């Protein structure tokens, strides 16, 4: 059984669903909620997909990360919350390695096929590179 679980959140419905799943299924486990701000990303992927590019200054990305962690605290008040900066997938994997995480529970938007190849998927990249099992919640 997993002793330490990492749940990356970005405030999306999918990441909150993954957190709720982790809280329900792993209530006796040390839970860490991680929000990653990538200062190098100029666009939100949803906005690029919708053809309405918008550049978010770092303050906005930080505000979103803070809001995601505040929401996480409502769902999992006993969880440790961590905010990190860097490329999202890489930062999640590195954190899991550094902290000897037993399991990562991550949400997925459920994109597949060409859109997944074109846009990439944080959940898919984490699943391929993580040092531990990854449970993807849809």
Model-derived regions: residue spans:
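Small/aliphatic-rich secondary-structure junction motif
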Residues: 2-49
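General small-molecule cofactor/ligand-binding pocket signal
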Residues: 32-34, 80-84, 135
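Short, hinge-like loop/turn segments at secondary-structure boundaries
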Residues: 49-52, 98-99, 122-124
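A short acidic, glycine-rich active-site loop
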Residues: 51-67
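Structural beta-alpha unit
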Residues: 73-104, 129
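Gly/Ser-rich helix-loop-strand patches that form or flank binding pockets
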Residues: 102-138
């Amino acid at each position: 059984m997993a002793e330490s679980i990492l749940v990356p959140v970005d405030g999306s419905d999918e990441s909150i669903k993954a957190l709720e799943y982790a809280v329900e299924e792993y209530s006796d486990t040390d839970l860490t909620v991680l929000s990653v701000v990538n200062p190098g990303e100029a666009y939100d992927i949803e906005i690029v997909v919708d053809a309405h590019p918008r550049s978010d200054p770092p303050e906005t990305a930080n505000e979103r990360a803070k809001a995601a962690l505040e929401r996480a605290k409502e769902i999992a008040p006993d969880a440790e919350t961590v905010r990190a900066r860097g490329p999202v997938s890489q930062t999640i994997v590195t954190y899991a390695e550094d902290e000897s995480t037993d399991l990562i529970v991550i949400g997925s938007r459920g994109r597949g096929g060409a859109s997944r190849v074109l846009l990439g998927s944080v959940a898919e990249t984490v699943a391929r590179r993580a040092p531990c099992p990854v449970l993807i919640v849809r």
